[in-house]
Every structure is written in C-alpha cells, then in structure tokens.
C-alpha cells in the first residue's frame, strides 16, 4: 500500500506542479471496424515521421489486444497494464526503439486487465501532456470499435485520424465515429487515410462519399490526409514481423506512407509554432 500511495502522490505532483500548456501534438488513430490496417498504417507512419528528423512517441492503446510490439518483433518490458494497475507511471514504460522513435506498448490476454474508464483516461492524458514537449508528435493507436474507452481517447486527443478502406462497411463505421465525435462537440481536426486502395480513383471516390455524408448530415468537415494502395506484400512483412517501410523503401506504398508522414508532420509543425517546450522527464 505504501508503494501505491507513493505512486498516487507522484501522479498528483505531476498534475499540479507542471504547467501543462496547450499544444496540438497528440494525434489518435481510429477506424471503427477492425481490418482496415490501422495499426500497420500508424506504426509505419511513426517510423516515417521519425526519419524526417522528428522525435515520435507511439502509444498502443488497444486495450488488452495490443499488437504493435508483435508487429515490430519487440519484447515489451513494462506495458500500459502496469500503468492502469498503478504499478508504474507513464514515462517509466517508454521503450526506445530508435533514437527518434519511442514506444509505450500495451498488453494482451490479461484476465485482470482493467477496463480503462473515463477517470483512467484523464490520468493517462495528464501524463501524456507532461511528456509531450519531449517529442515533436505523439501518436495514439486506439482499438477498433466505438466503445466509451475509445471515444474518451479520441475526445482528449488534439487531432484524430480515421483509417478506413473503400469497403462500404468500413466507410459507414468511419462515419459513425465522426457522428459520435460530433455529438460530443469535438472541435479538433478530423483527418482521413484511405487504405487498401485499388487505384487513386478508389481513394478519391471513397473520401468524397464520406466527406459529403459528414458535411450534409453532421455539418462536419474532414480532410484527406493520404491514400495508401493495396499491396499483398504487406501481409508478408506482418507475418515476418518486419516493418514494411523499412524493408521495402522504394515501393509505391512506402512512398505514399512517406508522403502522408510529411503532410502530417507539416500540419503538426504549423499548429505548434508558438508553443515552446517545457521541462523534460526523460
């Protein structure tokens, strides 16, 4: 109990003694349905942004079904399980994958994994914001679906990226996420990545349909961040636990990911020009 009390005291100190100045660095990935390639996109984007000489923190928030560490073939030490059970503070979970790319991994298959409630998400974001000025961008990979834990993360993030595909079910689920955010008066930027496109027209048509529906029925504006082509090599790298953009740098998919990474990096940089750094925990 003494150790737990010390953790709570340290958490409150972080919350009260640090001036958590507003920034626009925290970006959450969501998809609505599974199978859109959200984690593949987010992990490869994180790597691509880090290669642009930007420092990236990636947090895998897929509660008890995390797989970013599996995709990277990394054995995680401490995970978000340790945070949500009060064993560790967030900065103690950081795995330094490369100098400019750090990860906080989740865990999978824990029978006692606590369901992240609103108060836990609030504590999580207090600590994320205490870390954010050590990084140029913080990427959050949420779980599939529209559960309250996922929506809470999206509402707390500065910007959201919806990863969808041309499949009608995926587009509808993306629309539902936008509807949830709209009903909760979320004012952050909402961007879309169309994954698994057959060609450029496929992505354009998909985005236009989603954008028109969001604007007409919800009065919401969404922006196209990128289009990623379907490539059957992707599944091979996932099975081999290899990072696609690192192994196949000259493919069309990798170039599209890099283009999307540059665009996102520029958006974040412009949004944060007037926000200086503060004290570091690292």
Feature roles, as predicted:
Residues 239-282:
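NTP-binding/hydrolysis catalytic cores, primarily Walker-type P-loop NTPases
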């Amino acid at each position: 109990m003494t150790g737990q009390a010390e953790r709570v005291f340290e958490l409150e100190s972080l919350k009260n003694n640090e001036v958590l100045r507003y920034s626009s660095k925290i970006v959450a990935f969501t998809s609505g349905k599974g199978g859109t390639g959200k984690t593949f996109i987010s992990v490869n984007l994180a790597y691509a942004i880090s290669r642009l000489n930007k420092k990236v923190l990636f947090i895998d928030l897929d509660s008890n079904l995390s797989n970013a560490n599996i995709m990277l073939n990394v054995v995680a030490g401490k995970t978000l399980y340790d945070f949500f059970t009060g064993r560790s503070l967030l900065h103690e979970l950081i795995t330094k994958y490369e100098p400019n790319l750090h990860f906080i991994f989740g865990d999978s298959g824990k029978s006692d994994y606590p369901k992240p409630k609103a108060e836990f998400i609030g504590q999580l974001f207090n600590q994320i914001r205490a870390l954010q000025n050590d990084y140029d961008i913080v990427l959050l990979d949420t779980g599939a679906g529209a559960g309250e834990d996922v929506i809470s993360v999206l509402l707390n993030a500065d910007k959201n990226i919806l990863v969808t595909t041309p499949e009608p079910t995926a587009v509808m689920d993306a629309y539902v996420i936008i509807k949830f955010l709209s009903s909760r008066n979320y004012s952050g930027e909402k961007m879309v990545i169309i994954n698994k496109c057959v060609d450029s027209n496929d992505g354009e048509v998909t985005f236009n349909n989603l954008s028109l529906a969001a604007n007409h029925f919800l009065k919401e504006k969404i922006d196209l961040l990128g289009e990623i082509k379907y490539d059957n090599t992707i599944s091979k790298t996932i099975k081999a636990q290899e990072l696609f953009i690192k192994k196949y740098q000259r493919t069309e998919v990798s170039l599209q990911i890099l283009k999307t990474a540059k665009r996102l990096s520029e958006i974040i940089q412009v949004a944060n020009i007037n926000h200086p750094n503060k004290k570091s925990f690292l």
